[in-house]
């Protein structure tokens, strides 16, 4: 039976019987922590628990935390620290944007297993591609800070610098 908890501001769910090993499951854009259930069904019998969190702005989170790396990465680092206090062995299972954020949150940390699906590994290249599609130069983005583009997204100089 899943156990619903909160780690800092992050809603989380823990799957599996107590174990010495745990995966952090980080969903992608428009996902949610419950996506971890299928993965947990595979690894729980192998002696791994699965802890999954909702990224900022997902699954009804209305706590004001935005899905930007300077807010999401420290939140995932807090989850990582929570895990290090409770499990001897850590793994990461992450999807797309969640993979990029998780890799930053776990930089320099020992991870026994790292399973990434459709990982976004080069955020800078992706943002530069979106700039080109929108016909926006880096100089204009630097000057304006943020520029809304078709499709409901906003290009951000701060985000590009972070990447």
Regions found by a protein language model. Give the residues of each.
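Gly/Ala-rich beta-loop-alpha elbow adjacent to hydrolase catalytic centers
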Residues: 94-102
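The alpha/beta-hydrolase serine catalytic core
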Residues: 4, 89, 109-163
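The serine-hydrolase catalytic nucleophile loop
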Residues: 29-41
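Short beta-strand element of the alpha/beta-hydrolase
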Residues: 20-28
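N-terminal cap/lid segment of alpha/beta-hydrolase-fold proteins
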Residues: 1-17
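Conserved alpha/beta-hydrolase
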Residues: 40-62
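Catalytic nucleophile-loop/oxyanion-hole region of alpha/beta-hydrolase
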Residues: 58-86
